[in-house]
Structures are given as C-alpha cells and as structure tokens.
C-alpha cells in the first residue's frame, strides 16, 4: 500500500545541488520558482525515487554538530540519503574520476553486512553509497 515517493532537503545553492545530484544519476523533472522570489522548489528523479530540494533566500546552514556522522547519528531527526549501487568500490572510484570527491572514499563493511561509504553534498548533507542487497 505505501511506497517511498520522495525525500525533501533544503539547499543553499540550487545550481550546485543540481550539478552534484546529476552526477549521482538524478535528473531534474520539475523546477518551480515563486514569482516573488520567496522559494524555489526543484524535483530530481532517479528511478522511482524523487529528491525534492527547497531553496529559501533566508535559509540557514546546517548546525555544526552535523559535521561528523558519528555525532549526527546521536541527534534525533533525518540523517542521510542512501543510494544503492552494485559495486561500492567501483562507485567510489567513479566519483573520484568525475570529480565529485577529492579523494576516494573509505569503504566500511557495515554492522548490517553491506559495504558502504559516505560523501557530503554541497550543503553538508550526508549521502550514503551502499551495496545492493
């Protein structure tokens, strides 16, 4: 009955965020701009999943505690966007090759038995790249 539809994030620079998520195989499907400039909403799609981005002119940056995943996980609330890939090592190399990351991310085995690594989007939001089940 219930299926995932979208995940919403607030961003500081829509164009930087679009560029980042395009490299993760998302494509823009909708781009709304309020006439008064009060908000811009962009939807990007990857498969059946939609990432919805909000940009408000007076938006604030993430709090400092979000700088490390270990500390962030201890705070209640949404934590990260997870994207699955067939080959985590290949994905890590690919992200370095296309310039999305400066260094090849360290891959962890994971307590739940699936290899993964984390990167951050332009606003510091964690994105987990995890092996397919």
List PLM regions with ranges:
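Conserved active-site tyrosine of GNAT-family acetyltransferases
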Residues: 17-22, 95, 124
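Short glycine-/small-residue motifs
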Residues: 128-129
């Amino acid at each position: 009955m219930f299926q995932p539809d979208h995940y919403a994030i607030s961003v500081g620079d829509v164009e930087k965020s679009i560029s980042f998520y395009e490299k993760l195989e998302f494509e823009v499907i909708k781009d709304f701009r309020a006439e008064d400039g009060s908000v811009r909403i962009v939807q990007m799609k990857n498969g059946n999943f939609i990432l919805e981005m909000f940009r408000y002119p007076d938006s604030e940056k993430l709090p400092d505690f979000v700088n490390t995943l270990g500390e962030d996980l201890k705070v209640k609330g949404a934590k990260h966007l997870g994207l699955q890939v067939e080959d985590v090592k290949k994905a890590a190399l690919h992200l370095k090759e296309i310039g999305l990351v400066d260094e090849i991310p360290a891959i962890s085995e994971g307590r739940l038995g699936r290899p993964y690594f984390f990167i951050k989007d332009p606003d510091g939001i964690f994105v987990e790249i995890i092996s397919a089940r």
